């Protein structure tokens, strides 16, 4: 599955200009890192060529934080996968970097107030 997404994600990350905000650069790195299960601040800061502490400071300067950007990317991707694929929720949870599907279900419910399956069904109707 990862191999299908990897080329486009690598191209997107490489095409970001130095003028992109730190949040945009973190989002791009997360899009690449999530399916491989390495969506943590250490991995993202390594991909961006800065220390984890510098990354935290830069995100803070933009009134954000790593966990907020991670949650935003996960929510966006979850909505996309549910609306445009027939992947089972367990696979979506894996692609979003969750170790346990129940963690994904709880997070999705906190974002939307409904279960992933209910959200998918609502998109169909």
Regions found by a protein language model. Name each.
Residues 1-125:
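Extended mid-to-C-terminal alpha-helical interaction segments
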């Amino acid at each position: 599955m990862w191999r299908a997404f990897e080329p486009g994600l690598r191209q997107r990350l490489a095409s970001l200009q130095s003028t992109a905000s730190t949040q945009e650069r973190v989002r791009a790195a997360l899009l690449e890192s999530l399916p491989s299960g390495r969506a943590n601040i250490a991995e993202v800061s390594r991909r961006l060529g800065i220390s984890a502490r510098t990354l935290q400071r830069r995100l803070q300067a933009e009134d954000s934080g790593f966990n907020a950007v991670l949650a935003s990317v996960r929510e966006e991707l979850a909505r996309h996968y549910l609306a445009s694929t027939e992947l089972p929720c367990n696979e979506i949870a894996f692609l979003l970097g969750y170790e346990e599907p129940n963690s994904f279900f709880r997070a999705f419910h906190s974002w939307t107030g409904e279960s992933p399956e209910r959200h998918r069904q609502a998109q169909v109707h």
